[in-house]
Each structure stands twice: as structure tokens, then as C-alpha cells.
């Protein structure tokens, strides 16, 4: 029985490596296994195989080498250590930095005090939250707690707090297995679009149609900003269009592991902020508030690039 478990452990490790290196989530039939076996889980499995009882040194060596290779591979692809740009002083309106806070609140039962405290701490220009729960009946309390912000609950529990003027509000579209909302903001040069996405996970459906649907809302505009819970790790092949036309903010200017879920464990990077080429990412931070949500919150500081650069 012990030998059988040891063999199953190795087979699982080899399957996970095959998924991470080659198969990925091209096909929905095996995508769930790709999502379930990220590099940190494979590293944990290889360490477990290294510590397997009643094995000699030579028998442990393959698992030990696999652990070292996986640790290097994971850290080299997940650890962000970008040099932050200096945040400029406020001069012309175009030069003012734009600070955005995003967080999946995981449907709180009442007023989310953790969220209120984080907004007060970070003072963003725009804060957006998905899975805001029954926030509609609490808008007055949120407005009272955060009087500097215009508070609005959009359909499908997307909550927006903004210090910027909303130039236009587009209808919320709800394609199969996903929700997203789009609105234009004014106050940092020309009006620019913001798309907030919440893609639902499903074991037997590919996430590509939903990701492509969200991408289509950007119209490939270089000033677009896309925020949300993609329920899809940054290693996914379905994010190729985003990688071609946009920059992921934490990868560009963050420090630390880019994974945002679950509960402080760096397993999957499913919460993203994508910015178009007209934006420079000055800083990106990640906050864990484990009593408030099993997702990390993301805070980014952007600035429009000068046309003369």
C-alpha cells in the first residue's frame, strides 16, 4: 500500500509537470487539473516525496532534485521585484497619478469594516469590489463611513467608490458564466474606460469565451483599464490577448509573489489589473486581510504617459 501511494505521488507529479509545461488549459477537459495543480502544489508534493519513509539517499535524490527545480521555477516566474518609479507631484491634471484599489469581498453578510478600513488606509481615487454581498441596503452606511467617495452598487454585486467624475455608465453585460461592468471616468486627461470583471469558475466549461468577451469590451483602447477576479491564473493560455495589448500591473511594479488566492497561501494569481499602453505603472501593492476575504486586495498607482516621451 505504501509503495502504491509512493507511485501514485510520482504519477501525480509527472502529470502536474505535463500540465504546467505543455497542456496548460488549452482544453476544458483537463483545464481543471491545470488549475488544481499549480507550481506551489507540485513543489509541496515533491517535498513530500523527498521525505517519504524507508527510502535511501539515492532513492530520495530524484524527488530532492525535482523540489529544487520546482522551487527555482516557481520563484523565478512568480516573484516580482520591479523597480518602482517615483510618484510625481501633482502638476497638470494629466500628470496626476491615479490610484486604484480592487478587492473580491467574498459576499460579506453586513457592512464590510475591513474594506472600509482599507479604503481609509490607502485613499484610492477609485475603488472597485466584486462579490460585495447585500451592499445595496448598506450604501448609506458606506457613504457615511467614506464621505469623500461617491458610492454606487452596480448589478451583480459590483461596488464602486470613486473620487473621479463618471463620464458615462454603460449597461452591465452578463454573458454565460461571467459578469462585467464598464464605465468611463474623467479627471486624468481624456475620459478612459474601466472594465470590472467577475468570471465564474466552472469545472466543465472553458473560461476562454468569458475572457474573450471581457477583452472585447476594451476595444483594444490603449487607455483602457481592466480589473477583476478572472478565476484564471496568469499562466493561462487564454490571457494571450491581454498579454499582447495590456500590462498586468503587479507584474510590472509589484514586490513579492503575485498569487492572490487563497487565504494568504500563494497558490493562484486569479485577481488581475490590466492597463493599456497609455498608462505607466508606478507602484503595485498586495494586501491580505484574512478575516475579511480569502482573496488579496490589489492597489496600483498609474500615470498617463507623456505624449512627448
Put a short name on every predicted segment.
Residues 100, 106-120, 126-309:
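Soluble catalytic domains of enzymes that build or remodel membrane lipids, polysaccharides, and related
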Residues 65-118, 169-172:
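N-terminal signal-anchor transmembrane helix
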Residues 1-92:
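N-terminal membrane-anchoring alpha-helices
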Amino acid at each position: 500500500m505504501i509503495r502504491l501511494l509512493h507511485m501514485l505521488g510520482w504519477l501525480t507529479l509527472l502529470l502536474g509537470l505535463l500540465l504546467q509545461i505543455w497542456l496548460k488549459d488549452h482544453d476544458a477537459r483537463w483545464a481543471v487539473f491545470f488549475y488544481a495543480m499549480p507550481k506551489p502544489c507540485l513543489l509541496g508534493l515533491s517535498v513530500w516525496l523527498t521525505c517519504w519513509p524507508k527510502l535511501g539517499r539515492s532513492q530520495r535524490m530524484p524527488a530532492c532534485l525535482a523540489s529544487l527545480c520546482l522551487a527555482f521555477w516557481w520563484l523565478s516566474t512568480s516573484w516580482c521585484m520591479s523597480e518602482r518609479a517615483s510618484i510625481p507631484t501633482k502638476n497638470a491634471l494629466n500628470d496626476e497619478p491615479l490610484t486604484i484599489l480592487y478587492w473580491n469581498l467574498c459576499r460579506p453578510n453586513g457592512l464590510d469594516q475591513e474594506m472600509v478600513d482599507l479604503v481609509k488606509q490607502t485613499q484610492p481615487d477609485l475603488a472597485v469590489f466584486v462579490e460585495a454581498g447585500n451592499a445595496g441596503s448598506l450604501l448609506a452606511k458606506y457613504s457615511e463611513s467614506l464621505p469623500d467617495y461617491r458610492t454606487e452598487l452596480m448589478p451583480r454585486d459590483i461596488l464602486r467608490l470613486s473620487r473621479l467624475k463618471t463620464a458615462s455608465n454603460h449597461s452591465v453585460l452578463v454573458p454565460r458564466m461571467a459578469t462585467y461592468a464598464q464605465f468611463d471616468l474623467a479627471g486624468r486627461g481624456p475620459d478612459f474606460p474601466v472594465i470590472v470583471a467577475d468570471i465564474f469558475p466552472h469545472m466543465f466549461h472553458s473560461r476562454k469565451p468569458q475572457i474573450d468577451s471581457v477583452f472585447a469590451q476594451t476595444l483594444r483602447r490603449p487607455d483602457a483599464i481592466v480589473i477583476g477576479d478572472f478565476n484564471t491564473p496568469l499562466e493561462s493560455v487564454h490571457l494571450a490577448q491581454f498579454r499582447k495589448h495590456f500590462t498586468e500591473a503587479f507584474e510590472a511594479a509589484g514586490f513579492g509573489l503575485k498569487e492572490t488566492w487563497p487565504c494568504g497561501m500563494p497558490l493562484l494569481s486569479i485577481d488581475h489589473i490590466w492597463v493599456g499602453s497609455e498608462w505607466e505603472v508606478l507602484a503595485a501593492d498586495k494586501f491580505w486581510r484574512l478575516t475579511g476575504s480569502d482573496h488579496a486586495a490589489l492597489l496600483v498607482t498609474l500615470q498617463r504617459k507623456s505624449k512627448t516621451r
